[in-house]
Amino acid sequence: MSTVASLVVGRDGSTSKDKSSNGVSSDADRKAFLARRRKVDCILIGGNTARHEPYKQSPVPLVIVSRSTINPVVGNDLSHLWNMSPADALAKAKSQFGVRILVEAGTSIIFELIDQGLIDQLELSVTPVTGGDDPIDWQALLNRFENHTHTNVDGTDFYIARN
């Protein structure tokens, strides 16, 4: 594992409910999410993710890519606020913290890094939830990768996609 992007969506492609991915998550997704974080050197997120998701604590260094000068996760001693492109932040994170980077950002940062060929693996959870906000075509997202595997745990579909 080098650079892995993690994303949860509802069955209809919803990426959030009430501005948080927790609304489209499931128990099985949450377990996979926590296990995934134990295997990385650093987590990279965007400013919006930092403002709307619970990042007051992180098990490893947390890089927040944002144009703001205000750290949205004050109190997280492992957080780093970097005003630079996601690609530059990814390169800097690898040099400072190690090569195993987990991108837990929103779709705009994840899609940008995929477009630049900087995501080695996508771990996509598709839950039974519908009726959320900001939908994406998750099947088209999977099709951007050459290979993918699928498992189902308690109604949540897990896809691992690689090029």
Explain the meaning of each model-derived region.
Residues 1-163:
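Enzymes that bind and transform nitrogen-containing heteroaromatic metabolites
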